[in-house]
């Protein structure tokens, strides 16, 4: 009997959601520092190691700031800066990309109406992508299924040059974004783009299901041709 190739995946080390530490909270101003360290060892064709056995160490660090806005009730000014430390692309960079910006945005957050932010954001497409993103090294590549990138400023889940509204109403999550790009991408193909998503949670006892839908539309710069 001919045996097909089987894969063995072994995870070791520490992997978690971001741990946060509040280092300042006074007079309506807050400052949180957070981060994550992730270590992985894998072997097999269905893992990031391919046909070999490899390890990967990565992580992230960020700061989140808020300030009460007195002129608008229940509203805060918010800002986030987050960096990727070394890499999350399953290799071991030790050069200039040791620290890459993941998020950098400022905006307003209202208790009732949600937040309006601008900068490099976690875009609306991630409402769908986050369902399996935590397993991206060991599941089919969700980034390939109808999700398009045409230049460095219009890509999968971290979006440059974006004005975005995020809101939650009675279990409904809505995100809308207008994308102008950052003007410093490798091929500057983007003229403008728009994204939207909707996510709803249903709970049946201890069981919960959360369907989501997202859409993305964009316009290329006139005269720019790419293969994406």
Where are these regions (language model features)?
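Bacterial N-terminal signal peptides that target proteins for export
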Residues: 1-7
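Short polar catalytic/cofactor-binding loops
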Residues: 37-44
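Extracellular/periplasmic Venus flytrap/periplasmic-binding protein
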Residues: 183-185
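Outer membrane beta-barrel
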Residues: 22-37, 49-181, 190
């Amino acid at each position: 009997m001919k045996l097909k190739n089987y894969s063995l995946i072994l995870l070791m080390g520490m992997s978690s959601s971001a741990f946060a530490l509040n280092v300042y909270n006074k007079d309506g101003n807050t400052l949180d520092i957070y981060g994550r360290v992730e270590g992985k060892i894998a072997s097999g064709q269905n893992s990031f190691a391919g046909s070999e056995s490899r390890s990967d160490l990565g992580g992230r660090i960020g700061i989140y700031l808020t300030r009460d806005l007195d002129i608008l009730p229940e509203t805060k000014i918010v800002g986030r800066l987050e960096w990727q430390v070394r890499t999350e692309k399953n290799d071991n960079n030790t050069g200039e990309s040791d620290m890459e910006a993941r998020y950098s945005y400022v905006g307003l957050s209202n208790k009732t109406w949600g937040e309006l932010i601008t900068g490099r954001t976690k875009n609306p497409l991630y409402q769908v992508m986050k369902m399996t993103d935590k397993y991206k090294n060991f599941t089919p590549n969700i980034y390939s299924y109808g999700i398009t990138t045409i230049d460095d400023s219009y890509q999968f889940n971290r979006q440059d040059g974006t004005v975005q509204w995020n809101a939650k109403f009675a279990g409904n999550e809505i995100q809308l974004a207008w994308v102008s790009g950052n003007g410093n991408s490798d091929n500057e193909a983007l003229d403008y783009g728009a994204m939207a998503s909707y996510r709803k949670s249903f709970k049946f006892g201890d069981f919960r299901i959360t369907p989501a839908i997202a859409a993305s539309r964009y316009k290329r710069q006139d005269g720019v041709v790419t293969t994406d």
